[in-house]
Amino acid sequence: MNFINETNEEKKNKTNDDDALMQKFLNTRQIILAGEINKELSEKIVRQLLLMESLSATKPIYIYIDSPGGDADAGFAIFDMIRFIKAPVYTIGMGLVASAASIILLAASKERRFGMPNSHYLIHQPLSGIKGVATEIEIHAKELEKMRVKINKLIAEETGTDEKKVAKDTDRDCWLNAKESVEYGLISKIAKNRKDIPEK
């Protein structure tokens, strides 16, 4: 019985710590986007964006991204919300920014996109693990092609890179380090410390 009580108390303390940490992030208008991008993470990030906008539609929001990617639709939900809210949003790449995460990175305007010195980036065509009858595979293949074209067009528009080059680059995994990402147009600058990122 004592063990259960202690466990419940530990859970309560952890919840309180998490709530305090979340409040700290809300106050400083910082969002950590880490791990696989899925519906659950998308809903969490969207809620935080809407909440921060309700607190101030003029103060900037900073999203730190470290993600191997995941569901493209969940990524586009975050992308659209970043574009939807009035508050200016900065995206900062750290660690790995891959696949759907790179799309979220591009939601901020180019001058508001940064990368940390050791960050690296992966852009590629959407992947499919579909199995089933031939007609289902054919339908899915058509949707996948639409998604591929949409992503290539978005990358081209946001980086200033020719769409044909983007299509060629993303036909296979295209890895870029921080310096190469600046040259490609994914980010505008390498942020070595906090003062490299504007506060307003």
UniProtKB/Swiss-Prot annotation:
Keyword annotations from UniProtKB, A to Z: Cytoplasm, Hydrolase, Protease, Serine protease
Top-tier EC class: hydrolase
Active site: S99 (nucleophile), H124
GO molecular function, one term: serine-type endopeptidase activity
UniProt key word Protein transport: no
Xref: Pfam families: CLP_protease
SUPFAM superfamilies, A to Z: ClpP/crotonase
Subcellular location per the Swiss-Prot or TrEMBL entry: Cytoplasm
Known EC number: 3.4.21.92
GO BP, sorted A to Z: protein quality control for misfolded or incompletely synthesized proteins
Catalytic reaction list: Hydrolysis of proteins to small peptides in the presence of ATP and magnesium. alpha-casein is the usual test substrate. In the absence of ATP, only oligopeptides shorter than five residues are hydrolyzed (such as succinyl-Leu-Tyr-|-NHMec, and Leu-Tyr-Leu-|-Tyr-Trp, in which cleavage of the -Tyr-|-Leu- and -Tyr-|-Trp bonds also occurs)
GO cellular component entries: cytoplasm; endopeptidase Clp complex
Protein family (similarity comment): Belongs to the peptidase S14 family.
Subunit field text: Fourteen ClpP subunits assemble into 2 heptameric rings which stack back to back to give a disk-like structure with a central cavity, resembling the structure of eukaryotic proteasomes.
NCBIfam families xref list: PRK12553.1, PRK14512.1
Function noted in UniProt: Cleaves peptides in various proteins in a process that requires ATP hydrolysis. Has a chymotrypsin-like activity. Plays a major role in the degradation of misfolded proteins.
HAMAP family to which the protein is assigned, alphabetical: ClpP (MF_00444)
Protein name per UniProt: ATP-dependent Clp protease proteolytic subunit 2
Organism: Treponema denticola (strain ATCC 35405 / DSM 14222 / CIP 103919 / JCM 8153 / KCTC 15104)
Gene this protein is translated from: clpP2
